[in-house]
Amino acid sequence: MNQALICPRFEKAMSIMSQRWTGLVIYQLLAGPKRFCTLESSMSISGRVLSERLKDLEQQGIVKREVYPETPVRIEYSLTDKGMALEPVLREIEKWSQEWLQAE
């Protein structure tokens, strides 16, 4: 395939989504806001990698980080409208995986 024919926006979207754990982080947040520790334990992801992914997704405008001034401080992560727009894509991947992939 001629590389010049690939849409730059599509290429950027694939670059974002192909980062390890990114799709799973977004998928977890489809259910609603989550705290860091909840995300970390639900995916068996290292804290360092999760922190990197959340920062990347926040910079891309896909995830919102909200700090609640309580004692102790509570921080929740949720999807922005841009992030929620990925729901149909992830649901289709989920359907495809259930039909075509074997459970391990």
Language model segments and positions:
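N-terminal helix-turn-helix DNA-binding core of bacterial DNA-binding proteins
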Residues: A4-V49, V73-E76
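Residues within the DNA-recognition helix of helix-turn-helix
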Residues: R53
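Basic, amphipathic "hinge/linker" alpha-helix immediately C-terminal to the N-terminal HTH DNA-binding motif
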Residues: P69-E92
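Hydrophobic alpha-helical core bundles mediating ligand binding, dimerization, or RNAP-core interactions
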Residues: F10, M14, L90-S97, L101
